[in-house]
Every structure is written in C-alpha cells, then in structure tokens.
C-alpha cells in the first residue's frame, strides 16, 4: 500500500494519457497539490516525448487555419479559469451541496463520465470511518486537514492507495477535520455492527444509481 511504485504507476499512466475522467482528475489534483509528484510527472512527460520523437514513420498532423483559431480560443478560455482542477469542474469549492451519510461524515459525488466512483469527502474533527476494506482499489487524496489510520498520518497533498488486502479505520484530525478526494473502483466492505448497517445502505443505494 502507498508504495513509490504504485504512485509512479499512477503518475506515468496520467502522463501517458491512458486514464479516464476519474483518475485523470484525481492525478491532476495530486500534481496540483504535491510539487514533488509534479516534478516526477515532468520527467515522465519528457521521457515519453523523447520516445515519441524517435518513432519512425509518423507524420506530424497538418493543421488547418480554423484549427489554429479554435486552439487559441480554447487556451484563452482555460487561462481565465482557476488553476485548481476541481474548480474547473464544480466551480467554487466553498459552495458544495454536501450529502450527510452519518453524523460528521459528508460526501459529494462528482459529475464525471467514468466507471470509477469519484467523491469529495468531508469529515468533522475526530470523525471516524468504520473498519473496512475494498473490492477494488481505493485512491484517497487529502485536500485539506488530515486523517490517520493504522498505517500513518496523511496531510494536505498526501495520497493513499488501498486494495483488497488492506483493512483500515480512518479518523479525521481533531483540530480541523479533513477534506479528501476519493476514487473507488468497486464497493466498500465494512466490518462490525455499524459496518453491517453501512453495507446494507450501500447495497440499497446501488439500485438508485
């Protein structure tokens, strides 16, 4: 979990353009918050560009005059937007319509066209998520505040990657809570009495997606 190899794989996949909307958004936000990860992405970008330049038999794309106009307009439009990748999708992050799952825990599902589920999660100070595991991978990026679990403490710009072998019980810091961006490839599996209720809630909710 959280190995350098896993993080490098995520960044390289992003640089290669192999991701859908969910992981592209997640990784771009990770690079936005983490300067060290952004430097790695630049290295991968340069490597891929060099490899591409050495390929034979590939002709440069011929552009029309109208293509140039569209490109200039697009760049100008994007430059007027905030640098935060999330703000480009949902606007002002302070005006999110949070949905309460249980006391101290709120979420907001992002409008992306992808099989992976992408959510913003907001946990009040000291709030915990019951012990759980995952049927697929889970990616968590701390946007504000911090949380801790059995494997360490995670602050703004830190990323955690979990798989089916990991069980953890995240708890938001007691000072200012935690806001995270989360991707889950499949359903979350909770343990314990409260976990059983959440599993039932998740099962019922799946019929209304």
Language model region names:
Residues 95-125, 130:
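A short glycine-rich, His/Asp/Glu-containing loop-to-beta-strand
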Residues 166-190:
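Ligand-binding loop in jelly-roll beta-barrel domains
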Residues 8-21, 25-85, 91:
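Short alpha-helical interface segments
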Residues 107-109, 118-122, 139, 159-161, ...:
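Conserved hydrophobic/aromatic beta-strand scaffold that supports enzyme active sites
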Residues 149-170:
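Short acidic-glycine-tyrosine-enriched beta hairpin
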Residues 181-209:
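Double-stranded beta-helix
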Residues 124-127, 134-149:
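Glycine- and acidic-residue-biased ligand/ion/polar-headgroup-sensing regions
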Residues 111, 121, 130-134, 150-152, ...:
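Short histidine-centered beta-strand/loop micro-motifs
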